[in-house]
Amino acid sequence: MISISHYRLFYKVKLAKLTTKEKDNAINEVRILASINHENIAGYKEAFFEQGSSSLCIVMEYADGGDLQTKINQHKKTMQYMKEEYIWSIFYQMVSGLFALHKKKIVHRDIKCANVFLTKKGTVKLGDLNVSKIAKAGVMQTQTGTPYYASPEVWKD
Protein backbone atom coordinates (compact mmCIF):
# COMPACT_ATOMS: atom_id res chain seq x y z
CA MET A 1 0.00 0.00 0.00
CA ILE A 2 1.29 3.44 -0.87
CA SER A 3 -0.06 6.66 0.61
CA ILE A 4 1.20 10.08 -0.41
CA SER A 5 1.02 13.32 1.54
CA HIS A 6 2.37 16.65 0.33
CA TYR A 7 5.87 16.10 1.68
CA ARG A 8 6.19 12.41 2.41
CA LEU A 9 5.65 9.03 0.82
CA PHE A 10 4.40 6.29 3.13
CA TYR A 11 4.48 2.69 2.09
CA LYS A 12 3.88 -0.63 3.75
CA VAL A 13 5.80 -3.81 3.15
CA LYS A 14 3.67 -6.77 4.21
CA LEU A 15 6.30 -9.01 5.73
CA ALA A 16 4.09 -12.11 5.99
CA LYS A 17 3.98 -12.47 2.19
CA LEU A 18 7.73 -12.08 1.65
CA THR A 19 10.52 -14.62 1.43
CA THR A 20 13.32 -14.38 3.98
CA LYS A 21 15.56 -12.73 1.37
CA GLU A 22 12.88 -10.14 0.53
CA LYS A 23 12.41 -9.36 4.24
CA ASP A 24 16.17 -8.93 4.61
CA ASN A 25 16.18 -6.58 1.59
CA ALA A 26 13.39 -4.44 3.08
CA ILE A 27 15.19 -4.11 6.41
CA ASN A 28 18.48 -3.50 4.59
CA GLU A 29 16.88 -0.62 2.67
CA VAL A 30 15.77 1.03 5.93
CA ARG A 31 19.26 0.69 7.43
CA ILE A 32 20.92 2.16 4.36
CA LEU A 33 18.41 5.00 4.01
CA ALA A 34 18.82 5.88 7.68
CA SER A 35 22.60 6.06 7.25
CA ILE A 36 22.63 8.62 4.43
CA ASN A 37 21.52 12.23 4.19
CA HIS A 38 22.09 13.74 0.75
CA GLU A 39 19.92 15.96 -1.44
CA ASN A 40 20.11 13.47 -4.34
CA ILE A 41 19.05 10.42 -2.33
CA ALA A 42 15.36 9.93 -1.50
CA GLY A 43 15.15 11.11 2.10
CA TYR A 44 14.30 8.66 4.84
CA LYS A 45 12.02 9.99 7.59
CA GLU A 46 11.15 6.98 9.77
CA ALA A 47 10.20 3.31 9.82
CA PHE A 48 8.05 1.32 12.21
CA PHE A 49 6.40 -2.09 12.49
CA GLU A 50 2.60 -2.24 12.38
CA GLN A 51 1.44 -5.23 14.43
CA GLY A 52 -2.09 -5.54 13.01
CA SER A 53 -1.01 -6.02 9.41
CA SER A 54 2.47 -7.43 10.14
CA SER A 55 3.88 -4.67 7.96
CA LEU A 56 7.09 -2.70 7.92
CA CYS A 57 6.01 0.91 7.33
CA ILE A 58 8.51 3.29 5.78
CA VAL A 59 8.04 7.05 5.57
CA MET A 60 10.10 8.69 2.83
CA GLU A 61 10.52 12.06 1.20
CA TYR A 62 8.03 12.49 -1.65
CA ALA A 63 9.38 13.45 -5.08
CA ASP A 64 6.44 15.29 -6.62
CA GLY A 65 7.76 15.12 -10.20
CA GLY A 66 7.44 11.34 -10.64
CA ASP A 67 10.19 9.11 -11.97
CA LEU A 68 12.55 9.53 -14.91
CA GLN A 69 11.11 6.55 -16.82
CA THR A 70 7.65 8.15 -16.85
CA LYS A 71 9.15 11.48 -17.94
CA ILE A 72 10.99 9.78 -20.84
CA ASN A 73 7.83 7.94 -21.89
CA GLN A 74 5.86 11.20 -21.89
CA HIS A 75 8.45 12.81 -24.16
CA LYS A 76 8.41 9.80 -26.50
CA LYS A 77 4.62 9.87 -26.70
CA THR A 78 4.59 13.55 -27.67
CA MET A 79 7.67 13.10 -29.89
CA GLN A 80 9.57 15.84 -28.06
CA TYR A 81 13.23 15.87 -27.16
CA MET A 82 14.43 16.66 -23.68
CA LYS A 83 16.65 19.71 -23.59
CA GLU A 84 20.34 18.85 -23.39
CA GLU A 85 20.81 21.10 -20.33
CA TYR A 86 18.04 19.18 -18.55
CA ILE A 87 19.65 15.82 -19.38
CA TRP A 88 23.04 17.04 -18.09
CA SER A 89 21.40 18.32 -14.90
CA ILE A 90 19.81 14.91 -14.28
CA PHE A 91 23.08 13.12 -15.03
CA TYR A 92 25.11 15.40 -12.76
CA GLN A 93 22.67 14.94 -9.86
CA MET A 94 22.58 11.16 -10.35
CA VAL A 95 26.38 11.04 -10.21
CA SER A 96 26.34 13.27 -7.13
CA GLY A 97 23.93 10.87 -5.39
CA LEU A 98 25.98 7.84 -6.43
CA PHE A 99 29.15 9.53 -5.21
CA ALA A 100 27.52 10.11 -1.80
CA LEU A 101 26.55 6.42 -1.65
CA HIS A 102 29.99 5.23 -2.75
CA LYS A 103 31.72 7.44 -0.15
CA LYS A 104 29.87 5.33 2.43
CA LYS A 105 30.75 2.16 0.48
CA ILE A 106 27.09 1.64 -0.48
CA VAL A 107 26.50 0.08 -3.91
CA HIS A 108 23.00 0.78 -5.32
CA ARG A 109 22.86 -2.27 -7.65
CA ASP A 110 19.60 -1.31 -9.40
CA ILE A 111 20.18 1.97 -11.22
CA LYS A 112 17.50 2.48 -13.85
CA CYS A 113 15.21 5.31 -14.91
CA ALA A 114 12.29 3.98 -12.83
CA ASN A 115 14.45 4.36 -9.69
CA VAL A 116 15.43 7.96 -10.43
CA PHE A 117 12.84 10.29 -8.92
CA LEU A 118 12.31 13.95 -9.73
CA THR A 119 10.90 16.94 -7.90
CA LYS A 120 9.01 19.70 -9.67
CA LYS A 121 11.87 22.04 -8.70
CA GLY A 122 14.30 19.91 -10.74
CA THR A 123 16.03 17.96 -7.99
CA VAL A 124 16.92 14.33 -8.72
CA LYS A 125 16.50 11.71 -5.97
CA LEU A 126 17.91 8.19 -6.27
CA GLY A 127 15.58 5.69 -4.68
CA ASP A 128 14.64 2.03 -4.33
CA LEU A 129 17.69 0.96 -2.38
CA ASN A 130 16.28 -2.42 -1.32
CA VAL A 131 18.97 -4.47 -3.11
CA SER A 132 21.79 -2.09 -2.19
CA LYS A 133 24.73 -3.45 -0.30
CA ILE A 134 27.55 -2.12 1.78
CA ALA A 135 30.78 -3.20 0.10
CA LYS A 136 33.06 -5.02 2.52
CA ALA A 137 36.16 -5.71 0.42
CA GLY A 138 36.96 -6.74 -3.12
CA VAL A 139 34.40 -7.46 -5.82
CA MET A 140 30.79 -8.37 -5.06
CA GLN A 141 29.94 -11.82 -6.35
CA THR A 142 26.13 -11.77 -6.24
CA GLN A 143 24.08 -10.68 -9.22
CA THR A 144 20.94 -8.72 -8.55
CA GLY A 145 18.87 -5.87 -9.91
CA THR A 146 16.81 -5.67 -13.07
CA PRO A 147 18.08 -8.20 -15.68
CA TYR A 148 17.42 -5.99 -18.73
CA TYR A 149 19.73 -3.35 -17.25
CA ALA A 150 22.59 -5.75 -16.55
CA SER A 151 25.80 -5.31 -18.49
CA PRO A 152 26.65 -8.07 -21.01
CA GLU A 153 29.54 -9.43 -18.95
CA VAL A 154 27.24 -10.45 -16.09
CA TRP A 155 24.91 -12.49 -18.30
CA LYS A 156 25.51 -16.21 -18.02
CA ASP A 157 24.36 -18.92 -20.40
Where are these regions (language model features)?
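Conserved N-lobe beta3->alphaC-helix segment of eukaryotic protein kinase catalytic domains
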Residues: 12-36
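A short, aromatic-enriched beta-strand patch in the conserved N-lobe beta-sheet
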Residues: 46-48
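Conserved short submotifs of the Hanks-type protein kinase catalytic core
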Residues: 53-67
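AlphaC helix of the protein kinase catalytic domain
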Residues: 69-81
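Activation segment signature within eukaryotic-like protein kinase domains
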Residues: 90-91
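Catalytic-loop of the protein kinase fold
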Residues: 102-118
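Conserved activation segment of eukaryotic-like protein kinases, specifically the C-terminal portion
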Residues: 141-154
